[in-house]
Amino acid sequence: MKTNDIVYGVHAVTEALLANTGNKLYLQEDLRGKNVEKVKELATEKKVAISWTSKKSLSEMTEGAVHQGFVLRVSEFAYTELEQILAKTRQEEKPLLLILDGLTDPHNLGSILRTADATNVSGVIIPKHRAVGVTPVVAKTATGAIEHVPIARVTNLSQTLDKLKDEGFWTFGTDMNGTPCHKWNTKGKIALIIGNEGKGISSNIKKQVDVMITIPMNGHVQSLNASVAAAILMYEVFRNRL
């Protein structure tokens, strides 16, 4: 079994079952409790076969990850078409899109998706190449958010930004020398770009950004983790729109 064909952990498994993407459920054979009963009932309701399996076997399936005794074989993750996300934003008054430029850490992507779900982000756009996609680690870290936040995977981010501008979006990037986020005008259609963990936003994408935003800091470090920076800025938009 390929690790990309599974999700694991009670929350990720539950959300995948609710989304009807599960094919077979593997439960740790000595596991008991309310969570087990709930997941069993849900799997039965969704007509998903259940196999009681040893902890060792589950650990082998997940390549040693923390699975909590729950592993679900799933259909391949279905990315959303960019046009579907754009159609969705046309129905929204003030949509917020998140663009991840070359993010490579699955934990960062999972954390960002979890926050995106909490802050009403209309969709997330990631590149097909040189970037992490939706993996079991992403699914577990996101604790089910991948079933609720539309995620598009595109071949060319630069062309995608051109499309977004044609749709009336303002593009914002992150930079140490930008406008402080507390002075950020968050009205209208926003496309927020978060760069690679080490290199930041790529130079060709920077040229297309309308306004750079910075997060004021007063400590000794010069930058924040990508998922933390993304969370702060997503919540800044969310807070201003409450």
Task: Please report, for each region that a protein language model flagged, where it lies by residue.
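A short acidic, often aromatic-flanked loop/helix-cap motif at beta-alpha or helix-coil junctions
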Residues: K56-M61, A78-T80, L157-L161, T179-C181, ...
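Structured adenosyl-cofactor binding patch, chiefly the S-adenosyl-L-methionine
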Residues: A19, K140-T143, K206-L242
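Short, hinge-like loop/turn segments at secondary-structure boundaries
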Residues: L42-T44, H67-V71, K140-A145, K189-L192
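Short beta->alpha connector loops at strand-helix junctions that form conserved
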Residues: Q28, S54, D101, P127-K128, ...
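N-terminal positively charged helical leader segments and presequences
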Residues: M1-A87
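Active-site/ligand-binding-proximal alpha/beta "capping" segment
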Residues: F172-N225
